[in-house]
Swiss-Prot record:
The keyword Protein biosynthesis applies. This is Methionine--tRNA ligase. Its main location: cytoplasm. ATP binds at residue 334. A motif ('HIGH' region) lies at residues 13-23. The lineage of its organism: Bacteria, Pseudomonadati, Chlamydiota, Chlamydiia, Chlamydiales. Its EC number is 6.1.1.10. It is found in: Cytoplasm. One of its GO terms (biological process) is methionyl-tRNA aminoacylation.
Length: 550
């Protein structure tokens, strides 16, 4: 049984560049939709996210940009927060891994794993720069590929032949920054023995929600676990307590950021212990939203780290993954010019158009593609032609004919059948949201709009108006507005601005939204919302919900 308290996290965006549509539809829009849905259900929701601010990509790019590390991550942390706001991502708190609470809890995780014999030190050979006086991680190294002989191969992968290897396997390795020759030296690192938790992890993944194809990948991954280094030779990161000049690997510290970010939130609301009711209570339902490339870290490695703790940290109940969103058939890449400027896009097209289309093409079980042609088609045929048309034509007819106050009409059987079908579709939408399917939710939204349009066409109130049958006209308008009320409800998680406009225009007397945060509507998806027997509507002049995309 699902808890009344819901913890939601989404993969921490890496503070190394702007977010693109692929990031949004992969982790942040699905998490936001689920959070909005659960709030509507009356659940106590906490949605935590934040910037992932350590790691080699950050140090290397900051150095190449001539910026300090903190200055560099500050820039992208602000950019990510702004992007979340522009896209209507209703995160309850957006923290960062440079927060005050992060170092202590990361080091505590490490010590607990040590005490349980799950972390042990090991001496290995790593590349060292005499000129720079330090060990260099793979991103700082270039050299000759050991497979194909390409002389500018990266430290972890050859971009010429695609081979992957350890940086120390490169021939003639040199520093990416200075070009200096490198040599091998012994260095000590800590390793997490994941293979010692194999049985615990297999049992754990059997009890959580995973998409079927992801479950197969995770099970196979656990079968082939091996020790994994948790420390690196860097200066930027969380210091390792018992190893000098070492910091934790970003994959080790980043997921702990969900917990430290919740501590950060608790402090911000003046209740420092509030984080415990989400992380130390196993009755909480915890849903995590990620891209598929983060699966192993969230399905296996972070749960393994939690298993090795003295505190009973909450483990994920539903790990909701997305495949990749492509742009016109290719991966989003700013360096290759294959990207869309999000700010410019939102200056031209409404937010709900973008949210709807990204949800409708969400890459839930396979890669999907964003193209402007499909964006245009969906906006014009679905949002304008079906959805907006239904709302506008009903309200325009009602206002034109002075039928703006509607209540308790005498309904015929065909009206009751229409209401019943509308309710069934709304309940279907709830099931789709609960099962993390934005695609199916979008289909159901359009199905309900089409049902409403069909009913209005079939009943043809304009003909009845000419005959002077105003009681019947009002009954039809009442049923159509009731359908629009349900349409607004099931649309809200994906198109919040549009849903609120509909509710404002039909003004159902059963709702008092004045005291609610429009970004966090609470406790509306209830049995009383579906009751039409006492409902009344006060209709306003219609406002076009969507315009055509040229």
């Amino acid at each position: 049984m699902e808890s009344s308290r819901i913890l939601i996290t989404s993969a921490l965006p890496y503070a190394n560049g702007p977010l693109h549509f692929g990031h949004i539809t992969g982790a942040y829009l699905p998490a936001d939709v689920y959070a909005r849905f659960q709030r509507l259900q009356g659940k106590e929701v906490l949605y935590i996210c934040g910037s992932d601010e350590y790691g080699i990509a950050i140090t290397l790019n900051a150095e190449l940009a001539g910026m300090g590390y903190q200055e560099y991550v500050d820039m992208y942390h602000k950019l990510h927060k702004d992007t979340f706001k522009k896209l209507g991502i209703s995160v309850d708190f957006f923290s960062r891994t440079t927060n005050t609470y992060h170092p202590a809890i990361v080091q505590d995780f490490y010590r607990n794993l040590q005490e349980r014999g799950l972390v042990e030190n090991q001496v290995t050979e790593q590349l060292y720069s005499e000129e720079e006086g330090k060990f260099l991680a793979d991103r700082y190294v270039v050299g000759t590929c050991p497979k194909c002989g390409f002389d500018r191969a990266r430290g972890d992968e050859c971009q010429q032949c695609g081979a992957d290897y350890e940086a120390r396997d490169l021939k003639e390795p040199r520093s990416k920054l200075t070009g200096a020759a490198l040599s091998l030296r012994d260095t000590e690192h800590a390793y997490l023995h994941l293979e010692r938790m194999k049985e615990d992890l297999l049992a754990f993944v059997q009890g959580i929600y995973l998409r079927p194809h992801i479950r197969n990948f995770v099970t196979d991954y656990i079968e082939h676990l091996r020790p994994r280094a948790v420390t690196r030779d860097l200066s930027w990161g969380i210091p390792v307590p018992d190893l000098e000049n070492k910091v934790f690997y970003v994959w080790f510290d980043a997921p702990i950021g969900y917990i430290s970010g919740t501590m950060d939130w608790a402090a911000s609301i003046g209740d420092p212990e509030a984080w415990k009711k989400f992380w130390l209570d196993d009755t909480v339902t915890y849903a995590q939203f990620i891209g598929k490339d983060n699966t192993s870290f969230h399905a296996v490695i972070f749960p393994a780290m939690e298993i090795g703790q003295s505190l009973p940290y909450k483990k994920v109940d539903a790990l909701v993954t997305s495949e990749f969103l492509l742009l016109e058939g290719f991966q989003f890449s700013k360096s290759d010019g294959n990207f869309i400027d999000m700010d410019a896009f939102l200056e031209t097209y409404s937010l709900d158009k973008l949210r709807y289309v990204l949800a409708a093409i969400a890459p839930e079980t396979s890669d999907s593609e964003f193209s402007f042609q499909e964006f245009k088609t969906r906006c014009n045929s679905e949002l304008v032609g079906k959805y907006g048309n239904f709302v506008n034509r009903v309200l325009a007819f009602a206002v034109k004919n002075g039928c703006t106050e509607l209540s308790s009409p005498q309904l015929e059987q065909k009206d009751l059948d229409f209401i019943s079908k509308s309710q069934k579709l709304a309940k279907d939408a709830a099931e789709h949201y609960a099962q993390y399917s934005l695609r199916k939710a979008c289909s159901t939204i359009m199905e309900l709009a089409a049902l409403g349009n069909g009913y209005f066409n079939d009943e043809a109130p304009w003909k009845l108006a000419k005959e002077g049958n105003w009681n019947r006209v009002r009954a039809i308008l009442f049923c159509a507005c009731y359908c629009q009320k349900l349409l607004a409800l099931i649309s809200y998680p994906i198109m919040p601005e549009t849903a609120l406009k509909i509710l404002e225009m039909i003004a159902p007397h059963s709702l008092d939204l004045g005291s609610q945060d429009p970004d966090r509507l609470q406790s509306l998806w209830t049995d009383s919302f579906f009751d039409y027997s006492e409902e009344k509507f006060s209709l306003k002049e219609p406002e076009l919900l969507f315009t055509m995309v040229e």
